Amino acid sequence: MPKYVFVTGGVVSSVGKGITTAAIGRLLKSRGLRVALMKLDPYLNVDPGTMSPYQHGEVFVTEDGAETDLDLGHYERFTDENLSRASNVTTGQVYSAVIAKERRGDYLGGTVQVIPHITNEIKARIRQVAELHRPDVIVVEVGGTVGDIEGQPFLEAIRQMRREEGRRNVLYIHVTFLPYIASTGEVKTKPTQHSVKELRAIGIQPDVIICRTDHPVGDDVRAKVALFGDVDEDAVILLPTAETIYEVPLMLERAGLGRYVMEHLGWDDRDPDLADWERMVERLKSPRRRLRIALVGKYVELHDAYLSVVEALRHAGLAHDVAVEIVWVNSTAERSEIEAALRHVNGIVVPGGFGPRGVEGKMLAARYARERGIPYLGLCYGLHMAVIEFARNVLGLCGANSTEIDPETPHPVIDLMPDQRGVEMGGTMRLGRYPCQLVPGTKAALAYGESLVYERHRHRWEVNNAYREAFEAAGFVVSGQSPDGRYVEIMELHDHPWFVGVQFHPEFKSRPNRPHPLFVAFIGVAKHVLREGEQRPLPLAEPVAMPAADD
């Protein structure tokens, strides 16, 4: 029977519960335990698949094709474990399931209520992870903040879990924030006291309180939190802001959290195997040089919209002992602004996306990289932008486009597959893990060092095979495809240092100690392209003609 660790948050949102949950998973795995992690999201959406990145950040795709919360990306990167759709539960999923059961008559005509029906469904989904993954321990993050009305059923469900599973099999960890008052030079504990008080009013007594802080905190603060929170002093963990998120497991271990969790759950503590992790963090904090990589997208104001891409670039930089500095380039900006940003970068990444807004800037970036020999990595939509730009400016296909952008284009170089036509959004995309057969001798094959790989997808539109021969004749070749030859998965330029576009999302599979080979190869070329500080002359490229359009 598995044991459970529940992580809640108080005082403010975005306090760091996701990183804390991932770090706890790392600490327990380093002690030889089989670990599973999951996120309970209180919002009413079924999943974040159709939510705006401005609202939610990136959508993280699991191996089995679930569109999930970005925190699952942290979980996978920290624990190096592939999660499943069962690892992300939303209020929308829970209510949909309960209502469907009521319609089928599963409740035998009874009155359907939040307690017990909604809470029972939540508990069943938590236990489903235990059945699927057979872990020793499940670490569960409860989204939102204590006091949010939509989170109440989830808190009630985890309260009941301790009663049903036994006190020694359930641990509650509460993550709070200690605000700093500059005028008095004090760190205040009162918000944490009230947050714990509210949690206790629900019936949950936290076993551990983790206090996030941006300023040094003394032992007197720890003692005060322990007194008002009714926990042991060594169960109050002071967690200052880290230089890198990957340092958090080491900070929590030094604070004694790993030992405390093991002892509370009735296990003998073991020495954690964190040597590789410590070396990785040390290298992250002391790189030999810096690279500037342009990330060209339309949601750059919210960096979380491209979280996995940024982390994958940093992982690849670690493999080459360089620090990757992201140059955020808004693809909706004026051409002159985009050009100015691209003058002094070592490489360009155009990440995934949807819709027509900002495509002009993305294609300008693709053309600049192609014409100037600058390393380019196009991810999903980034491949589409490179294909359209090449079709127009090299193949001479006037008006070439994607039918996603222009349904009436005379040259649909990017198009829906026939079986996708007429299907509405929401659960209709090509999602999850699919095989890709690599062409021997290509840059992609050399990067992977394998002939068959599996990658995660999230898209509806594909490269149109009707134009494949024309592209290959001009040097833009297919270097990876589905084993049946139906789908183009990777394209690359023959006569270019590194110009590769992929239909999938390799960033979802990158880990700090196991960076993705495509990102490693990209950074490996980029670090030889441009000396630090050097600038290229303007103009960079002629503008790409695109019709004005909005999302």
Swiss-Prot record:
* GO BP term (any one): pyrimidine nucleobase biosynthetic process
Q: Glutamine amidotransferase type-1 domain: from which residue to which, for each copy?
A: 292-532
Q: Where does CTP bind?
A: S13, D148, I149, E150, K188, T189, K190, P191, T192, Q193, K224
Task: Output the InterPro entries linked to this UniProt entry.
Answer: Class_I_gatase-like (IPR029062), CTP_synthase (IPR004468), CTP_synthase_N (IPR017456), GATASE (IPR017926), GATase1_CTP_Synthase (IPR033828), P-loop_NTPase (IPR027417)
* Residues the record marks as active site: C380, H505, E507
| SUPFAM superfamilies per the UniProt record, alphabetical | Class I glutamine amidotransferase-like, P-loop containing nucleoside triphosphate hydrolases
For the region Amidoligase domain, give the residue spans.
1-267
Activity regulation as described:
Allosterically activated by GTP, when glutamine is the substrate; GTP has no effect on the reaction when ammonia is the substrate. The allosteric effector GTP functions by stabilizing the protein conformation that binds the tetrahedral intermediate(s) formed during glutamine hydrolysis. Inhibited by the product CTP, via allosteric rather than competitive inhibition.
Q: What is its EC number?
A: 6.3.4.2
An example Gene Ontology molecular-function term: CTP synthase activity
Q: Give the top-rank taxon of the lineage listed in the UniProt record for this protein.
A: Bacteria
Keyword Nuclease attributed:
no
| Gene Ontology, cellular component aspect | cytosol
Q: Does the keyword Heme apply?
A: no
* Catalytic function, reaction form: UTP + L-glutamine + ATP + H2O = CTP + L-glutamate + ADP + phosphate + 2 H(+); L-glutamine + H2O = L-glutamate + NH4(+); UTP + NH4(+) + ATP = CTP + ADP + phosphate + 2 H(+)
Q: Where does Mg(2+) bind?
A: D71, E141
Pathway this chain belongs to:
Pyrimidine metabolism; CTP biosynthesis via de novo pathway; CTP from UDP: step 2/2
Listed binding positions for L-glutamine are Y54, G353, Y381, G382, L383, H384, E404, R460
The UniProt similarity line reads: Belongs to the CTP synthase family.
Record's miscellaneous remark: CTPSs have evolved a hybrid strategy for distinguishing between UTP and CTP. The overlapping regions of the product feedback inhibitory and substrate sites recognize a common feature in both compounds, the triphosphate moiety. To differentiate isosteric substrate and product pyrimidine rings, an additional pocket far from the expected kinase/ligase catalytic site, specifically recognizes the cytosine and ribose portions of the product inhibitor.
On subunit structure and binding partners, the annotation says: Homotetramer.
Protein's UniProt name: CTP synthase
Organism of this sequence: Thermomicrobium roseum (strain ATCC 27502 / DSM 5159 / P-2)
